[in-house]
Amino acid sequence: MILYAVLGAFAAFLLYMDVLYPFVIYPLRARWHKCGYIPRDLSWPLGIPLTLVVLSKLRKDMLLQFMAAQDLSRPYKTSLRQFLGKWVIATRDPENIKAVLSTKFNDFSLKERGNRMRHVIGDGIFTQDGAPWKHSRDMLRPQFTKDQISRVELLSHHIDVLIREIRKSGGNVELQRLFHLMTMDTATHFLFGESVGSLEVSGESKGIEITDPKTGEIVNTVDFVESYTFANKFALKKIILNDLEFLADLTEPSYKWHLRRVHTVMDHYVQLALKATEKYDPDDDSEKGEYYFSHELAKLTRDPLSLRDQLFNILIAGRDTTAATLSYAFHYLTKNPAIYAKVREDVLTVFPNGDASLATYEDLRKAKYLQMVIKEVLRLAPAVPLNTRAAVRDTYLPRGGGPAGNLPVFVPKGTAVNYPTYILHRDPDIYGADAYEFNPERWRPENKLPNSPMYSWGYIPFNGGPRICIGQQFALTEIALTMIKLVLEFERLEPADDFEPNLQDKSSLTVMVGGSGVRVKLS
């Protein structure tokens, strides 16, 4: 009897989720709210087939290409689809994305995505909603003034270390790994006032060495980078598993140990910041010395947990995204030697003596063709390729419903709206027939078109609206300076013998070049 009851309950649940909701309940509620019919991408039962395909493609580093091929082959840009039993709305329509991120901003939140990331990276600006998020934004935004984001001298030292490492290897290197080490160093230097020195770790030197006060374990730079990388992947796994996120905890029992190692390092710098600012007097001009991000935050809050969480959030955003953009830039430039030569020519017009050691923030903006290349890299490889929000109340998107797709789309409270930036940036309706091609020329001012992404929400590498990335100018400064110093140092960029020109785009919390990375020869 119990078995029959269980089977009956499951059959009723299946009937509701796979038939009644998509074909009866949702359409009736949409009509009540004066919204139109929306296409349905069916994957019976409970979206399980789609879920299994997504997990399979993710393991093979083929998820982004698979999703783009699927979505761009459909005649519509907004649809209702099922994933792990839940019905979600997916859209690549710029007007709908604008509504989610800007015009109807208060109708949406991070919801489960924020909660799941919070279990890993803490309660900070990238995991918060509502009043806590506004408080964090107001606290953090002043730290990204032009004076701070244009600290070229801070970045320049670490880029010089990168160049030294490339020279040591004879110019035959895998750049993606080096870029991730360099951006870890620049990010920690900016945040903590000193770098963890991951690029300089070699032989007997293990970089920083910090003792966990609870366990006595010594955590060095190698340990920190390893555990930080694990935390990144673990957070993504929890997001993908959705309501089954507990499976991530069960299948990765070492996650607590990895997080403890990361926290050991973060807590060390938090305590240094608290100690350095314990007698802070805002009216005492003599205290205004060298800028440290952690010290400035410690002047605003004395809560060590809050400080750690905010610093962890900023580190995640500032390190991996910049490394991803630099990696893709050199991947595409390796495949396009004529464009590399043109970038070098452009940079030499700004720095005719071949020396950018005294470059200023304003100098970086003068390399116009380089800026076009960076824009194109961010189009094809947006650092955060997939994103989502959830409706906090019954609301609607401006279009996508009805036979012609020009009626509003009903979004019930609690429903997730997925907007894949990676696919949006490849839409031929926005970028033309060559949307998949690496073509910096499309960004020339004279090439502006009525449907140009410069005038729409078809180009959002840093998101948009109130939650637009507050550190984007710092990231663009680091990307531009790194590329300038590398092209000035190395006249030639060639593929290494094991360079893979047609790599898959790998999705972690950020996008990464898959396969063996970016294997090149620089000379």
Swiss-Prot record:
The entry marks the following residues as binding heme, namely 469
Transmembrane stretches, start-end = 5-25
Give the location in the cell.
Answer: Membrane
InterPro entries according to UniProt: Cyt_P450, Cyt_P450_CS, Cyt_P450_E_CYP52_ascomycetes, Cyt_P450_E_CYP52_fungi, Cyt_P450_E_grp-II, Cyt_P450_sf
E.C. no: 1.14.14.80
Q: What induces it?
A: Up-regulated when grown on alkanes as sole carbon source.
- The organism's superkingdom is given as Eukaryota
Q: List, in alphabetical order, the Gene Ontology terms for molecular function in this entry.
A: heme binding; iron ion binding; long-chain fatty acid omega-hydroxylase activity
Function noted in UniProt: Catalyzes the terminal (at the omega-position) hydroxylation of a fatty acid. Probably involved in alkane metabolism.
> What's the protein here called?
Cytochrome P450 52-N1
Record gene name: cyp52N1
